[in-house]
Amino acid sequence: MTDGILGKAATMEIPIHGNGEAGQLPEDDGLEQDLQQVMVSGPNLNETSIVSGGYGGSGDGLIPTGSGRHPSHSATPAGPGDEVARGIAGEKFDIVKKWGINTYKCTKQLLSERFGRGSRTVDLELELQIELLRETKRKYESVLQLGRALTAHLYSLLQTQHALGDAFADLSQKSPELQEEFGYNAETQKLLCKNGETLLGAVNFFVSSINTLVTKTMEDTLMTVKQYEAARLEYDAYRTDLEELSLGPRDAGTRGRLESAQATFQAHRDKYEKLRGDVAIKLKFLEENKIKVMHKQLLLFHNAVSAYFAGNQKQLEQTLQQFNIKLRPPGAEKPSWLEEQ
């Protein structure tokens, strides 16, 4: 009866083909790749031996894998170096073993959730905030893309106006009868170029600040969110495992397993609750920082664009001074994003 209950508790709900093999699921490829990556970093077996006869094989089934070329005529007692190598190999094996068990439990929990056969822990308020953050990030990325496009168009316009101003100035010297007309058109284009460079500096500052907010501040919070979601999956996986063991018989063998499962579950629960608190704090700080940054940047963008199209050069320059924006001279190296803040 004990074997039947334990076998039922360890059963994973995966479709089986007619030949008795487990059905391939979309998650199988990713799991196989993860296994390959872990095994690559496994213990170094260059100075160990491989048993070719399977479990319980005789000593004749040992295949030496060392680099020695001369046959050994007598057994050599193991030295301190061999003990250290075995200890390292054992530690690596334990790491791979724990990773494999954890991956199996998490994959089982994930599949159960996908197919509606298992329960998951849900913090509705926190998950709503996380989804809102992801949606906000997508919208800000769109604003960032449009801001970069505007910067490219303004730069192209400045190049055209500069070339047009030079052409007018050259023609004013070579056409005495139209010298005055070409002259004031050349001055107008030069003034537009100057104001355009000021506007371009303001827009560049706006784009740089949005880029920092999206790719650094929001991304940092989302990295913590990913860690929280992984911890939630592990927590639910070990919670389910503990519940299955609790429903089984209470003999001497299962009692030890139950205590071990309880300790492991508590460790994952503490990790989950800690990361949940970290996410809540980061979301709060992110919202405050976003409002502060965007209030400043939207005011800058509005004042600069309004002054430029109104032809108010003085107000345009005052806007840059108000936000401590310094225009870079032609050919100067671009400052880092920290210097631009």
Swiss-Prot record:
Residue span(s) of domain AH: 121-321
Localization in the cell: Golgi apparatus; Golgi apparatus, trans-Golgi network membrane
UniProt keyword Aminoacyl-tRNA synthetase, yes or no: no
Primary location recorded for the protein, binned into one broad class: Golgi
PTM-bearing positions, type Phosphothreonine: 76
Function: Plays a role in constitutive metalloproteinase (MMP) secretion from the trans Golgi network. May have important functions during vesicle biogenesis at certain cargo subdomains, which could be predominantly utilized by secreted MMPs, such as MMP7 and MMP2. Also involved in autophagy by regulating the starvation-dependent trafficking of ATG9A vesicles which deliver the phosphatidylinositol 4-kinase beta (PI4KB) to the autophagosome initiation site. Involved in phagophore growth during mitophagy by regulating ATG9A trafficking to mitochondria.
Protein name: Arfaptin-2
Organism: Bos taurus
